[in-house]
Regions:
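Class I S-adenosyl-L-methionine-dependent methyltransferase catalytic core
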Residues: 1-151
């Protein structure tokens, strides 16, 4: 309950918007595509969610990062375009960590091309994450990452 959610590459916002009635609060949705961002804005408005509960940040979160809304992120959804280098994804996590924007018990849901499995495993290990769960759906992999204890 009360988990702070970051939904990077959010279009159409379904994951984070569905997390809100399940106890998440707030959700930050990031989307670089203008048309997709407009769909997210319409979805937020249709659900009558105020900016205190769901906020759209247009632009490329992988390039610029995102500031946590007063509390660190507990849950991050990452579903970037499959051509995205996994190093960019782990770079975002590193920048968020350096900004103290990640909860100690953070969970990351990372969907990526299955051909990147080895790179993701290596980057997770060297970045302080473990793959707690991995599922394959055709050419797609869904990893649930957890932070390793650093103390």
């Amino acid at each position: 309950d009360g988990a702070v959610v970051l939904d990077a590459s959010a279009a159409p916002g379904a994951l984070s918007l569905e997390a809100l009635p399940r106890g998440a609060d707030p959700a930050m949705l990031c989307e670089r595509d203008r048309d997709a961002a407009a769909v997210i804005e319409r979805n937020i408005a249709a659900l009558r969610l105020g900016r205190d509960r769901a906020r759209l940040l247009p632009g490329d979160v992988l390039k610029r990062g995102a500031a946590a809304p007063g509390r660190p992120f507990d849950l991050i959804f990452l579903d970037p375009p499959y051509a995205t280098d996994p190093a960019e994804v782990f770079g975002l996590l590193s920048r968020l960590d350096a900004a103290d924007a990640l909860a100690a018990d953070l969970i990351v849901s990372y969907e990526h091309d299955a051909s990147d499995d080895d790179a993701v495993e290596t980057l997770a290990e060297t970045s302080g994450y473990e793959i707690a769960s991995r599922r394959h759906f055709g050419d797609t992999t869904l990893d649930l990452l957890e932070r390793l204890c650093t103390e």
